[in-house]
Amino acid sequence: MKNMDIEALKSEINRIILERKDRYIRFLSELLRFRTVSASSSGRERAEAPDEFRKAFSFMEDEARRLGLEFRNHKGMAAVIEWKAAESGDEDDEVGIACHIDVVPAGKGWNYPPFGGTVADGCIWGRGTQDDKGPIGSIMA
């Protein structure tokens, strides 16, 4: 790629990011509110986890379908969100991105509620923001 092409590509990517920023913030803030605590947790969080995963998958499915994406839920344990970009049928045209929505227990010391999806101080705060709900939000935006 020529330097000019790279700069044009960067400019287009920045334009798309800014165009979709509010949608990303809304989606991620909502996704962070689901207490999708991993099976290694105990007590109340473990008891509530199956219902929270169902709700999170339902939310993700609604959003995927709104965006014209295909959503397949695999027994509440995994989901595939697919965009059919090419009709060639060639598997080499496909790209897969693996992400997860389970998080470890929040622990203490949070400045904002760990399952609040709070937008403050120029950040989105919540358990899973970096690992791995944030990347899911960027894909879905």
Where are these predicted regions, by residue range?
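Acidic/His- and Gly-rich active-site-bordering loop/insert found
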Residues: 3-129
